[in-house]
Amino acid sequence: MTNEFHHVTVLLHEAVDMLDIKPDGIYVDATLGGSGHSAYLLSLLGDKGHLYCFDQDQKAIDHAQEQLKPYIDKGQVTFIKDNFRHLKARLLEHGVTEIDGILYDLGVSSPQLDERERGFSYKQDAPLDMRMDSQAALTAYEVVNTYDFNDLVRIFFKYGEDKFSKQIARKIEQARAIKPISTTTELAALIKSAKPAKELKKKGHPAKQIFQAIRIEVNDELGAADASIQRAIELLALDGRISVITFHSLEDRLTKHLFKEASTADAPKGLPFIPDELKPKLELVSRKPILPSQKELMANNRAHSAKLRVARKVRK
């Protein structure tokens, strides 16, 4: 399993160290993935500390159960197989009403990208799937073959920010009228054919943004992140911290907006003083996002777009 689930953790020390770990604290890894952040966080906990790990991918949990066995044996880890949008409800089931810190590593993990049959990558021929939870109902196949023209344009533009969204949606509509589009390479070729020649000369794969858009739609990634981060802020104890790693502008803008909203006083301008109940709930630990070091960028190409934002709870 270890070899099958190889994952290089991004911003490992930065994301965990910025949580200011208390040895006896209660922490959450909202995106277990390859368990790199969890392993490092657990190494900083004392015997009374506990970590709750969320992932909707059973393979990630199976891998972590091998990697984190010493901590499991000591009763310091609880795995929860669910979408992190249900974070608060699932933690309440375990009697957890307050946490000292939480970490998010948003986006797709390397094993999911690299596992051909998951259909996340435009670089490998595979069935159109893209589900992070293999038990979920909606697949990329259904999005590509059943969404109408306007809905395709909407998700391509909104989640992929691709200026050729209409042309690509039209190509898909024409192709699927003849036969269903069933593989990643079929879809990638259609996307490429919809773009002008000068666009194809630009750096990066022409299908990258559209694949991202479909993946976000299939997994409702932004909706889940929005709901989860808001619940996480509610759960944080005073002085508790939240670390969020993002990999594209949509995730980063969402995180920045949620942090700004919670770190701004909810009071009209001009008041002589701000009542306690209207004071900000969060304080930004770093005003600008923390970026990977040059050393990390050289060692891990997937770290290039990573950004880390951190905030601290200052009011319940």
Curated annotation (Swiss-Prot):
Name the enzyme group at the top EC level: transferase
Keywords for this protein:
Cytoplasm, Methyltransferase, rRNA processing, S-adenosyl-L-methionine, Transferase
Q: Which InterPro entries match?
A: RsmH, SAM-dep_MeTrfase_MraW_recog, SAM-dependent_MTases_sf
Q: Where is it predominantly found?
A: cytoplasm
Q: Does the keyword rRNA processing apply?
A: yes
One example of the protein's molecular function in GO is:
rRNA (cytosine-N4-)-methyltransferase activity
Q: Which reaction does it catalyse?
A: cytidine(1402) in 16S rRNA + S-adenosyl-L-methionine = N(4)-methylcytidine(1402) in 16S rRNA + S-adenosyl-L-homocysteine + H(+)
Question: This protein's superkingdom?
Answer: Bacteria
What EC identifiers does the entry list?
A: 2.1.1.199
SUPFAM superfamilies attached to this UniProt entry: Putative methyltransferase TM0872, insert domain, S-adenosyl-L-methionine-dependent methyltransferases
A cellular-component GO term for this protein: cytoplasm
Where does the record say this protein resides? Answer: Cytoplasm
UniProt keyword Aminoacyl-tRNA synthetase, yes or no: no
Q: Which GO terms describe its biological process?
A: rRNA base methylation
Task: Detail which positions bind S-adenosyl-L-methionine.
Answer: 35-37, 55, 84, 105, 112
Q: Specify one Pfam family.
A: Methyltransf_5
Q: Which family does it belong to?
A: Belongs to the methyltransferase superfamily. RsmH family.
Query: What's the stated role of this polypeptide?
Result: Specifically methylates the N4 position of cytidine in position 1402 (C1402) of 16S rRNA.
Please report the name of this protein according to its UniProt entry.
Ribosomal RNA small subunit methyltransferase H
- Give the organism, scientific name: Streptococcus equi subsp. equi (strain 4047)
